[in-house]
């Protein structure tokens, strides 16, 4: 379709995204300019901002249904804002009512939750338009603007053939390449584990996050049966198989050292890892740039590994590397998944409205707390505008809404970027307004600035805010010729809005990740227990095994993300976090063992029933000991609960099989985690959620 150079340019993620966002903004302005209605064309540019926040450009099997819902909510919020303000209803009451009513969308699902800030932004934009036009005009702008936004994005995705999904899959393959290369380079290096493991954990976290993102995109497109979707589904299944075999670990450093001393295994293992990583990067480019993959083989590399494994049959490292690299090579050579499974067997269903409403009305509902926090912040912002005698405090309200993110760390970063970017943008715009640039040149510069801002938006929000601020100032200059009067008040409004958002995040029902560490650790242990049950069952099936393996990886990822965010939160006990960091490291080892055991169970390398039952009982008792240590304050304060002792596994005659070795190491890690949590508990905070004596009382 395109020559190679243009293909790399047009399919580049940042360029493709910037072109799409710039065209959907600027085409209505161009049409308005040609028709002599530049004002309406510029007002249309308000609607894509609401649609972007609502995620209405997300490829979805119910794309147009979501579009209708979004347009209806935007128009309804705009109408209610104008009518209630005309009845002299105080603005804080209006914003509180809208926020609390729309907050139920968060109970329906993460994609529906985006409708809350988008609808509130539509109401805030209406504040700036009220008094300048009839009541029906903002409604028409939102309805037609959303329709235009939806049709343009549908046409764009139809032309570029599911480009957002291709971008996610390409990033996943590239992350797997980096992870494989880094992991097997450390396998043969004498590196301090405390320094070597954190970078690997970060790469593993990114890979699992991308897998979750790809799965959500696949689910949202699951109604499609076209060839492109089926090809993307197959590529995603291959990525799951690759991640499964790349992320396994043997954890026998002594055996690795013996094999390295007796053979040239170090060079061969690194050769295999680098070959796999290079091929994954080529496949990442093929996916992104719509190219068919070329033929691939790594027979020489696998042959060298097989020779080492044959020459050293008593060393498990050679067999381990040969077995997993041969599976990886098979996927890369055949371009087919290792086994058949129903990837979408576990359907994600949104909660029906009435059960969602019932859950939302509970005081323990995170969605209700988030809506309450946002309503208080917006009310304070509107009262601040009244105290400063601002006729319309829409800029303070908009700043609060745009910088408030899910979590302390993300909100703090967004506040810094937004405030600095706005200040720089206002200074540049103030200087530029003195030059009295003609309208045609002004529109051209606005187009270039918008394109440049979207090009860097994903990587540098602060610099993108500079461009958006300049464009906003010139939009007001073209609409109402008051751009210079706008600069200083908007600077003050931005600072006030950022301060309100920061205060609300810290003091209004804060959801500290440090307070969720126990719950997330408990959930991860439950996922591990269910995975071990499936692995040691009499007839493990591939699809349930695959799903539970991903749940295990995602549960550990949630725990790891909580720990990282907790370490950035203010005034928290660093000794407790240091202990929990060690706990999470052992949790990662268990995940790697479960990944390895899943492949063994799928190939029916099972233990004898009596031995499997014995190991299952030992693992369950060890997991329950860890859970009880997390749940209760201290031994003896748990009432009727029984803090169980870990059983001693009796050694069996004969050499233990690979599966049995993994199970023994899992039990060892669980015992270590129990000891760590016993020490960490003494360092815990003594306030807030930590005053709950039992974990299940604070799970909501």
From Swiss-Prot:
The chain crosses the membrane at residues 24-44, 67-87, 89-109, 115-135, 139-159, 383-403, 420-440, 461-481, 491-511. This is Uncharacterized protein YhfK. The gene is yhfK. GO terms for cellular component: plasma membrane. It comes from the Bacteria. The keyword GTP-binding does not apply. It is a multi-pass membrane protein. The keyword Transmembrane helix applies. Keywords: Cell membrane, Membrane, Transmembrane, Transmembrane helix. It is found in: Cell membrane. NCBIfam families: YCCS_YHFK (TIGR01667). Belongs to the YccS/YhfK family. Pfam families: FUSC-like, FUSC_2.
